[in-house]
Amino acid sequence: MIHIGLFEGIGGFSLAAKWMGWKTLATCEINPFGQKILNHYWPNAYHHSDIHDFTYETIDIELSKRFGSSWRNDDIIVTGGFP
């Protein structure tokens, strides 16, 4: 199971996903402090800062660079914190 976290803050949903055995592959968080936390605990994930241009195409390109096209074969869970 793949997790993508929107409005991720300091990674609460990503931590819960880890506890569930899911892999967080991408996050989107605009706050610089939250970005530092996410980069520290999920260094291999793609981290984006602006939800306005966080599109499927962007995710596909960035995740394919990191994980190859096989990431598309898993089920995807998208979570969203409150902005």
Language model regions located:
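Conserved active-site and SAM-binding loop architecture
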Residues: 1-83
